[in-house]
Amino acid sequence: GFANCNALSLSTEPLESSLPFDRRRDGFVMGEGAGVLVLENWETAVTRKATIYAEMIGYGNTCDAYHVTFPQPDAVSSSRAVEQAMEEGDAFKIPPEQVYMNAHGTGTPVNDAIETLAVKRVFGRNAHKLYISSTKSMTGHMLGAAGAIEAIACLMALQEKILPPTINLQEQDEACDLFCVPNQAIAADITLAISNSLGFGGHNASLAFRRI
């Protein structure tokens, strides 16, 4: 199915096939994995002395139904999902230098450029101040598991104050010109982490997590 959609990378280099935000990208790489999170209200978690990794302060969910595989070119719907998550959590007051975004970042020619546009629509001139990375550069695209595992990556980034990189980013595309944490993890004292999932058919979801 994905091969017939021309969505998969045709690279013969297994360690350099997943290339989010790189001008050499030609499709995503399939991955495998699983992740489980427990979402619990604050009062019961505190009462039972649960380990709380972060507070989920907002979410956004939109669907543009633009095309079965092609994302909406103007990024209106995908940007609105991020805005919804930010607005619900009153997160626009957080300085952009304290924000990390785990991008959907599939490494397909179209997705990465349009997701970059979505970030610019939401954050405007501050878009270049965010930390952004695609962990799919390391894990591949785990399909149904991708969102859960990338949310976990956000939680660990908040806890450890270490941001995962976008590996293989050697020739950054001019259409993906934000700071994408290239190649090496970095230390950053972030307050907010956003997890983006932008699926086929125009299904867009964003989660906003705040450090506690």
Residue map of PLM features:
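A glycine- and small-aliphatic-rich helix-loop capping segment at beta-alpha/alpha-beta transitions
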Residues: 1-12, 73-77, 114-126, 210-212
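Beta-strand segments within the central parallel beta-sheet cores of soluble alpha/beta enzyme folds
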Residues: 51-59, 95-103, 130-136, 164-172
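Glycine-rich beta-alpha junction loops
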Residues: 6, 34, 43-44, 58-64, ...
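Short glycine/threonine-rich loop-to-helix capping motif typified by GTGT followed
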Residues: 66-78, 106-123, 142-149, 179-182
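Condensing-enzyme catalytic core mediating Claisen C-C bond formation in acyl metabolism
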Residues: 13-92, 99-100
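Conserved beta-strand-centric core segments of catalytic alpha/beta enzyme folds
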Residues: 1-44, 146-212
